[in-house]
Curated annotation (Swiss-Prot):
Residues reported to bind ATP: 625-632
Lineage: Bacteria, Pseudomonadati, Pseudomonadota, Gammaproteobacteria, Lysobacterales
Pfam families cross-referenced by the UniProt entry: MutS_I, MutS_II, MutS_III, MutS_IV, MutS_V
Gene behind this protein: mutS
The name this protein goes by in its record: DNA mismatch repair protein MutS
Organism: Xanthomonas oryzae pv. oryzae (strain KACC10331 / KXO85)
GO BP: any one term: mismatch repair
Length: 873
């Protein structure tokens, strides 16, 4: 058998003159979409050829084969079945690929020569709206970025949900934070150099011609799309970079979707000052919806998400990644949750929502005219629930709940229309028929009656023909090619009546047609075709009617989403014993008996609650204690409590009083960032630098073991300097965990003639024989032991190694390598020298070396100096 190396032969040809008509048709379609995978419809398969086939075979793990040859070379080919293509399409989109779907136009059986084909649809990671291609509980976003001397403009759209937003940021750090928050599936950038490092290698980045990101052309694009004379109503007149990005995004959507987008009706502007800022590192460290190792289990979202509907789940995720600083909004949410709990209404709402479905995305498909029959039935059932939801909300006095009650609107007429028009359980596809309910349209009912009665007519005809012909084995049947027929076996064919006309000859039988059967066939087949045609017409009419109601229906879906989130908050508060936080205008952070929501959820034994008390005169806690003692857990739990309070949730504490917070910034144990060529220590210093430059007196900062990535005294010096800067320059709320006991002396120092604003707390452990028991309780004052060797033994180090470590520890302590005074001479940190692991006494060689100036030496002088130094050793 001849084999072909598809990796070295048969690249996509430059000339198509010598190719077969089919391959010429393929190349014509491919030339319009050179960067996309082309799904080329051939019967029951979508085929891919040449480089597309190689790529798809690798990504989808499907067979790479060949389809004969064309132009004198074999044609690499791979294919996926039409009936299962959506699964393959979803996998490609998840990998950041875009696909052009080239369909057969018309009926191939009726085509004379080559069947016509045309690209009817383009699917990209950021523009998908099909239910099968979407994660139901996560937004699928398309983002565009423009840049200028002033910074970056961002625009992003959720085409499946009908949202379109813009923003502007000043710095690369802020840009990275926004991308980390929004996690776009597809990112459009100008095809230029010098983009930030974090964009390189990112899945779904599309480079577009730079001229598409021009502010003036973007403005014209937006005005034309929204049919407006100015953009003042959107509040983006003073945002040229955002306008440029929005125009580029809109142009890409129109280019790929090939249709109007009536569900995008406005642009919203996000205001950075309205939300608590969190950079990419903070989101990663706090494990909001993804753990540091990439797992999505045992995260804050996993514990918090008690929503019933997919659209509620997506809204909760958005809230979680953008905690608000708007006190009035948050107080209204807290009050709404409390009102639901007090009235016992959360359970009733959640029960009603179980039949609700994803109305938000269904309405998008209605707007795009791609809604399927079961979208209609889901929308019908959801609207039918509104009276029950209104009844539940009516007696509640929460201002926010009453606002949402009003936003539900009145949709009785639409509900009644769908109840009367749509079958109780419609089929998956319109082409299957039976979507429109009986009794809705008299003409359709009559056509269906003709089709329905056909079966009985055929039974009666078969019995009559058997009786009249005397052929007991005579059968009446139907196939799609030849239509209706009367079948008689070969042995009985001579008995066929004279008025039978032969229609088809088989090996063992003859098939006939009669005038009566032909008349019936014409009538029935016509009725079925007309029935499907009539259903399609009525279906399009429903889409037209619903299209006029879209704005009100979208508001209704938004209100239902928020009610789902608030009811979920109420359920979590009761199930997990959480309390309503208090938002204070004074600077403070007081948490009584706080717990870590995720750790508490996964533990099979009670969680040890702890307090936190920070205010104007006490802004930093230096936290000491053994490894595994709970320092990181304590810091994270307080950050998560603050975050939960600022999305409107209750919090895992008996009481929480929280003053104004503008940022949450963290530096908690990152691993090596090898992909970007950065060591653990480099990452640590970069994140620390960001915090020192951005923290304000209203920021909450978590610092975990600063300085551990370098030598002992280097690390100690850095940790001391960072702590002082945070306490005295930034003056932010800081939780500073450290293994340097010397830092506990900072609390006793004065600053600007007053107290330091620093306090010591520790997490303790006790030894019971050879066992070490962690207490996990936060106590005032510094720790007096680290228990490092005991933790090493717990980790399974060989006993011989632990014993050797104990001996070495005694030696080091006797040599003064480690101070037990818990104090550090400040001058030691100010001295301009580099300390090693142990401090050696000065020597003549060292003094001679320090006297040298390498920049002033010639090569010969340097060599002579080296010999002199060697002689001193």
């Amino acid at each position: 058998m001849q084999t072909t190396d598809f990796n070295t032969k048969a690249s996509s040809p430059k000339s198509t003159a010598e190719h077969t008509p089919l391959m010429k048709q393929f190349f014509a379609a491919k030339s319009d979409y050179p960067d996309l995978l082309l799904f080329f419809r051939m019967g029951d398969f979508y085929e891919l050829f040449y480089d597309d086939a190689r790529k798809a075979a690798r990504l989808l793990d499907i067979t790479l084969t060949q389809r004969g040859s064309s132009g004198g070379a074999p044609i690499p080919m791979a294919g996926v079945p039409v009936h299962a293509y959506e699964g393959y399409l979803a996998r490609l989109v998840a990998l950041g690929e875009s696909v052009a779907i080239c369909e057969q136009i018309g009926d191939p059986a009726l085509a004379k020569g080559l069947v016509e084909r045309k690209v009817v649809r383009i699917v990209t990671p950021g523009t998908v709206t099909d239910e099968a291609l979407l994660d139901e509980r996560r937004d699928t976003l398309l983002m565009a970025i423009s840049r200028s001397k002033q910074g970056y403009g961002l625009a992003w759209a959720d085409l499946a949900g009908g949202r379109f937003l813009v923003n502007e940021v000043d710095t690369v750090d802020a840009l990275e934070a926004e991308i980390a928050r929004l996690e776009p599936a597809e990112l459009l950038v100008p095809d230029e150099d010098h983009w930030p490092e974090f964009l390189r290698g990112r899945i779904g980045v599309r480079r577009r011609p730079p001229w598409l990101f021009d502010a003036d052309s973007g403005r014209r694009q937006l005005l034309a799309f929204f049919k407006l004379h100015d953009l003042s109503g959107f509040g983006i007149d003073d945002k040229p970079s955002a306008t440029a990005a929005a125009g580029a995004l809109l142009g890409y959507v129109e280019e790929t979707q090939k249709q109007r987008l009536p569900h995008l009706t406005s642009i919203a502007t996000e205001v950075a000052s309205e939300a608590i800022s969190m950079n990419a590192a903070t989101r990663r460290h706090l494990e909001l919806d993804t753990r540091v190792d990439g797992d999505t289990r045992n995260t804050l979202l996993g514990v918090l998400d008690s929503t019933v509907t997919p659209m509620g789940g997506r809204l909760l995720r958005r809230w979680l990644h953008r905690p608000l600083r708007l006190r009035d909004v948050l107080v209204q949410r807290h009050h709404a949750v409390g009102n639901l709990i007090d009235a016992g209404a959360d359970a009733d709402l959640r029960e009603a929502f179980r039949a609700l479905g994803d109305l938000e995305r269904i309405l998008t498909r209605v707007a795009l005219r791609s809604a399927r029959p079961r979208d209609f039935s889901t929308l019908r059932d959801g609207l039918a629930l509104l009276p029950k939801v209104r009844t539940i909300l009516a007696p509640l006095d929460s201002p926010r709940l009453q606002t949402l009650h009003a936003e539900l609107g009145e949709h009785d007429a639409t509900a009644h229309l769908l109840i009367s028009a749509v079958a109780e359980t419609p089929p998956l596809k319109l082409s299957d028929g039976g979507v429109i309910a009986s009794g809705y349209d008299a003409e359709l009912d009559e056509l269906r009656r003709l089709s329905t009665n056909a079966d009985q007519f055929l039974i009666d005809l078969e019995q009559r023909e058997r009786a009249s012909s005397g052929i007991a084995t005579l059968k009446v049947g139907y196939n799609r090619v030849h239509g209706y027929y009367i079948e008689i076996s070969k042995g009985q064919a001579e008995k066929a009546p004279l008025h039978y006309s032969r229609r088809q000859t088989l090996t063992n039988a003859e098939r006939y047609i009669t005038e009566e059967l032909k008349t019936f066939e014409d009538k029935v087949l016509s009725a079925r075709e007309r029935s499907l045609s009539r259903e399609k017409l009525l279906y399009e009419g429903l889409l037209d009617t619903l299209g006029t109601e879209l704005e009100g229906l979208k508001r209704c879906a938004g209100a239902l989403s928020e009610l789902d989130v608030l009811a979920g908050f109420a359920e979590r508060a009761q199930a997990l014993d959480w309390s309503q936080p208090e938002l204070d205008s004074a600077p403070c952070l007081r948490i009584e008996r706080g717990r870590h929501p995720v750790v508490e959820a996964v533990r099979d034994h009670p969680f040890e609650p702890n307090d936190l008390d920070l205010h104007s005169d006490r802004r930093m806690l230096v936290i000491t204690g053994p490894n595994m003692g709970g320092k990181s857990t304590y810091m994270r739990q307080n950050a998560l409590i603050v975050l939960l309070a600022h999305i409107g949730s209750y919090v895992p504490a008996s009481r929480a009083v929280i003053g104004p917070i503008d940022r949450i910034l963290t530096r908690i144990g990152a691993g090596d960032d090898l992909a970007r060529g950065q060591s653990t220590f480099m990452v640590e210093m970069a994140e620390t630098s960001y915090i020192l430059h951005h923290a304000t007196p209203q920021s909450l900062v978590l610092m975990d073991e600063i300085g551990r990535g370098t030598s002992t005294y280097d690390g100690l010096a850095l940790a001391d300097a960072v702590a002082r800067h945070l306490a005295h320059t930034n003056r932010c709320y800081t939780l500073f965990a450290t293994h340097y006991f010397e830092l506990t002396a900072l609390a006793d120092e004065s600053h600007d003639g007053g107290a330091s604003g620093i306090a010591n707390v520790h997490l303790d452990a006790v030894e019971h024989g050879e066992r070490l028991v962690f207490m996990h309780a936060v106590k005032d004052g510094p720790a007096n032991r680290s228990f490092g060797l005991q933790v090493a033994a717990l980790a399974g180090l060989p006993k011989a190694a632990v014993t050797q470590a104990r001996r070495r520890l005694v030696e080091l302590e006797q040599r003064g390598g480690e101070s037990h005074s818990a104090q550090m001479a400040p001058t030691a940190l100010d001295a301009p020298q580099q300390f090693g692991l142990f401090t050696a006494p000065s020597s003549a060689a060292q003094e001679a070396l320090q006297a040298l100036d390498p920049d002033e030496l010639t090569p010969k002088q340097a060599l002579e100096a080296l010999y002199r130094l060697k002689a001193l050793l």
